[in-house]
């Protein structure tokens, strides 16, 4: 299905709006449109990038007044002749126009099929095609900036540059194989090592950016933890500015992890309100605490809450569970309004989740943990899990090649390791190694039908 030349059609806008857009693409796109469109001139005679007013007609009956935008190959999104029909947003009108188009020779597009055609026509590389879905799904300024940069090319040029350098190294090594009987060394081993180390550093820098990129794309996970009844759910409600979570004086009320998303200055944070941590014989509460520990493990930021009364009673200030080295920790002392004279231990933040004291300061601190400056200064940031896995595999292959270089690995085996690096780096964009149909289907199944 991916490589056929059918003319395809699909709605490009969500249902429910005042207006709708229907997209059609393929060799017969304009001829098919002419069978149902009545305007001043045939669309087949129209130039690209022109808009035409007319009517959609069904067996002589006017269905709707529309505008049709014409795109000519190869200067269209898909690289094919294409048109976009702008009509009124009635679901009946949209479904009728699609029925007329399919009856006239088009077929309904599958998920992401327009973008598949753009990729196969060389209009986009794979990473740019994936960014189309990301930009549609973006829910914050930072996530939009990340997806928009990738859609404009992102690190595609840098990766292709790496592939070219690696191909040069491989060519020199394989030239040695052609002259193996003469024992000629075309690739100076010291220079080869230096070049491979530079490439490895570039790959590692891209890999290391994934933590930030994925957090921006998916939302920064923040686990709200602490003993029962310290005000965790009240804090989440205060951050949301609504009574989203049930609050009770009864210890152990929260038994499941509750997730809510909050946009703080252009970055989405995923707050995980967790069950209070304590020793208990209650089986359901124990299960909730186990889920709390799982939430802590996957969080980028951990908020550990206590309160003034517990501090006065000698409760520990620091959490008693382990944290990863890359996790940020915030210790909050809640209910400071009930004990204004209670001294705050060093490194803690005093708040009152009930009346809002210290909440804006908490928001600023959370936002400061996410450095998005790189997004707006052209730094390459990886946010796609497939790209991260490909770069990890490339880095592993390059390290094997470096180890082999140091141990005197045979030239043909060394060349093969470098070719593995090229394969994995090239799989990110798909330009240096054409992706399989299974990979394409997996990637484009995440796109909406009209894209």
Range-by-range predicted roles:
Residues 1-145, 149, 153, 325, ...:
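A glycine-rich (often HGG/GG-containing) alpha/beta subdomain
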Residues 2-11, 141-263, 280-282, 309-451:
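C-terminal-of-GTPase-core extension/linker across diverse P-loop GTPases
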Residues 23, 236, 273:
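Short, acidic/hydrophobic/Gly-rich beta-strand patch recurrent on exposed beta strands
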Residues 52-72, 252-280, 298-301:
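Switch I (G2) and immediately adjacent beta-strands of P-loop GTPase domains
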Residues 122, 229, 273:
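Conserved G/P- and acidic residue-centered "switch" motifs that form tight phosphate/ATP-binding loops
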Residues 271, 305, 332:
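Generic enzyme active-site microenvironment
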Residues 285-309:
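Inter-motif core of Ras-like GTPase G domains
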């Amino acid at each position: 299905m991916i490589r056929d030349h059918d003319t395809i059609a699909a709605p490009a806008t969500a249902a429910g709006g005042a207006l709708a857009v229907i997209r059609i693409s393929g060799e017969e796109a304009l001829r098919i449109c002419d069978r149902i469109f009545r305007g001043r001139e045939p669309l087949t005679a129209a130039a690209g990038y022109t808009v035409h007013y007319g009517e959609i007609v069904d067996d002589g009956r006017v269905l709707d007044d529309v505008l049709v935008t014409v795109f000519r190959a190869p200067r269209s999104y898909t690289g094919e002749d294409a048109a976009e029909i702008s009509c009124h947003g009635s679901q009946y009108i949209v479904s009728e126009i699609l029925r007329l188009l399919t009856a006239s020779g088009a077929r309904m597009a599958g998920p992401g099929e327009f973008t598949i055609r753009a990729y196969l026509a060389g209009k986009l590389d794979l990473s740019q095609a994936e960014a189309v879905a990301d930009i549609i799904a973006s829910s914050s300024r930072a996530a939009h900036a990340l997806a928009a940069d990738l859609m404009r090319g992102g690190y595609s040029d840098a990766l292709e540059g790496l592939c070219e350098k690696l191909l040069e190294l491989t060519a020199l090594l394989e030239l040695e194989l052609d002259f193996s009987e003469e024992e000629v060394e075309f690739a100076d081993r010291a220079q080869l090592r230096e070049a491979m180390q530079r490439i490895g550093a570039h790959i590692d820098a891209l890999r290391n950016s994934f933590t930030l990129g994925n957090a921006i794309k998916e939302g920064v996970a923040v686990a709200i933890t602490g003993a029962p009844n310290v005000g965790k759910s009240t804090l989440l409600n205060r951050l949301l500015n609504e009574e989203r979570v049930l609050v009770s004086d009864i210890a152990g009320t929260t038994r499941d992890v509750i997730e809510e998303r909050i946009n703080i200055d252009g970055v989405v944070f995923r707050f995980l309100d967790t069950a209070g941590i304590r020793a208990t014989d209650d089986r359901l509460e124990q299960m909730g605490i186990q889920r709390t520990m799982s939430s802590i493990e996957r969080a980028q930021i951990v908020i550990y809450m206590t309160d003034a009364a517990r501090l006065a009673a000698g409760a520990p200030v620091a959490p008693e569970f382990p944290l990863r080295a890359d996790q940020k920790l915030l210790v909050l002392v809640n209910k400071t309004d009930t004990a204004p004279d209670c001294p705050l231990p060093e490194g803690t933040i005093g708040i009152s989740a009930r009346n809002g004291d210290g909440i804006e300061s908490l928001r600023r601190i959370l936002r400061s943990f996410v450095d998005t400056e790189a997004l707006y200064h052209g730094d390459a940031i990886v946010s796609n899990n497939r790209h991260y896995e490909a770069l990890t595999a490339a880095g592993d292959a390059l390290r094997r090649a470096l180890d082999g270089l140091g141990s005197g690995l045979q030239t043909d085996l060394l060349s093969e390791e470098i070719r593995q690096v090229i394969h994995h780096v090239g799989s990110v964009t798909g330009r240096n190694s054409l992706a399989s149909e299974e990979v394409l289907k997996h990637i484009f199944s995440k796109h909406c039908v009209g894209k």
